[in-house]
Regions:
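Solvent-exposed, polar/charged alpha-helical surfaces in well-ordered, non-transmembrane soluble domains
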Residues: 32, 48-55, 59, 83, ...
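Short, small/polar residue-rich loop motifs at catalytic or cofactor-binding pockets
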Residues: 4, 9-13, 213-216
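Small/polar-residue-rich segments within soluble enzyme cores
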Residues: 51-59, 73-185
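Acidic/histidine-rich, surface-exposed loop or edge segments in extracytoplasmic proteins
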Residues: 28-40, 76-80, 179-189
Length: 399
């Protein structure tokens, strides 16, 4: 025989995600659907209290009493046991509806059916949306990205269950007002994000992307003393030209770092004592051929010191310094990147970290041009956060 009662799971309230100062980044809020079992109510109660309920609903939702009266009468005559009264109510509205005539008699005498749905809200709106993460579907509340996914085992809690009775195909109503097993709420997570810095980073990034009509971009702000990430903004462009928190580019996008790598290249050569900041390098008039491939600067700087070459971000300067020092022994230079673990993942709790790629002699990407290209940030791949982590160590005196 078909079971007429069943323990139906009750979702636990998901833990909150907070910014550094206690501001909410994500919180669980219950939403409520109120439905009506027109078959449970006695004829006398329906006749006496239904018009009062219709009037109360009409006043509260700004519709006519006759609209609700017709709905309730059709539900009664049609033997409907799951008639929708109101959807997606907040808790305040739910309490008001619950106390209206007829419904205040409860599930058996008043036909009240309450469907509680946990929903996730982000008080800061679109700011830090990708960093915080979101669920793939509202039904399963499954999280696959961001902090929501990284700390899901702690945030999700333990579901409870409630005994419900089958009243129609696919429709169930609670047997009593009490739960058989109370859900246990998830733990809260406090992040290092500073909402003021996050807000500034978000709008500064948006302004620059709009100005240059760029495809996407990211901003990460890291505290030097601790390495704590105080802001992480990611914006990608839509087909319509607007921007939104599309992907976590800072964590997931491994690409050629360009001129941001020059400092890293320079630091390795200094550490190896292969170059000196005062030595002279000829950047010529802004172009120089390396093994048949031309490298250019925006303008010529002539003969300048190695320190000045880094200061003016000269492609030719860095390529010349590194190629002259290491063309016969590139492994000496490359070993510093391995020693500094630039070729390995940071090991973040957030999934999807991009894999750094630093080629070595014998690799498919290696050629005579590899060394001068790498000196100014090409022919290798790192994520923005991996580059920033190295810069933060430099700013922190190597720690």
């Amino acid at each position: 025989a078909e079971k007429t009662t069943q323990n139906i799971p009750i979702k636990a309230n998901r833990g909150n995600i907070y910014a550094q100062d206690g501001s909410l980044l994500a919180t669980s809020v219950s939403r409520y659907d109120v439905r009506f079992d027109a078959m449970t109510v006695s004829a006398s109660n329906f006749e006496k209290l239904m018009p009062q309920l219709a009037h109360a609903l009409g006043e509260y939702f700004g519709r006519s009493a006759s609209y609700y009266q017709n709905m309730l009468q059709k539900a009664r005559s049609g033997n409907r046991r799951y008639q929708l009264i109101a959807r997606d109510l907040n808790y305040t509205d739910f309490l008001v509806i619950k106390q209206m005539p007829l419904l205040n008699l409860g599930p058996y005498r008043g036909g009240l059916i309450v469907v509680q749905k946990p929903t996730r809200e982000h008080p800061l709106g679109k700011i830090a949306e990708r960093l915080v993460g979101h669920n793939t579907t509202s039904d399963t509340m499954k999280y696959t990205v961001g902090l929501e996914a990284a700390f899901d085992p702690f945030l999700r809690g333990q579901d409870g269950h409630r005994l419900k009775q089958k009243i129609a195909k696919g429709q169930w109503k609670p047997v009593s007002d009490e739960n058989e097993l109370e859900p246990r709420d998830g733990f809260d997570v406090v992040t290092t994000i500073d909402i003021n810095i996050q807000d500034i980073a978000h709008h500064a990034l948006l302004s620059q992307l709009e100005y240059y009509e760029a495809e996407h971009g990211t901003v990460v702000v890291m505290e030097v003393a601790t390495g704590a990430v105080r802001a992480l903004a990611n914006l990608g462009r839509t087909a319509q030209g607007t921007y939104y928190e599309k992907l976590n580019y800072a964590v997931g996008e491994s690409h050629e770092p360009g001129s941001t790598f020059k400092t890293i290249a320079f630091a390795a050569a200094l550490e190896d004592r292969a170059i000196d900041t005062a030595q002279i390098v000829d950047t010529r008039l802004g172009s120089k051929a390396f093994y048949g491939r031309m490298i250019t600067d925006t303008k010529g700087h002539g003969k300048i010191s190695a320190a000045r070459a880094l200061e003016v971000s000269s492609n030719i300067g860095l390529a010349s310094l590194i190629d002259d020092a290491y063309k016969d022994s590139p492994e000496r230079w490359l070993n510093y990147f391995k020693q500094w673990r630039l070729d390995t993942l940071l090991g973040l709790p957030i999934s999807g970290e991009g894999q750094p790629e630093i080629p070595r002699p014998g690799d498919r990407k290696w050629s005579k041009n590899a060394l001068p290209s790498m000196a100014y940030g090409y022919n290798l791949r790192m994520t923005p956060l991996q580059v920033l982590t190295f810069y933060n160590a430099l700013a922190n005196d190597g720690a």
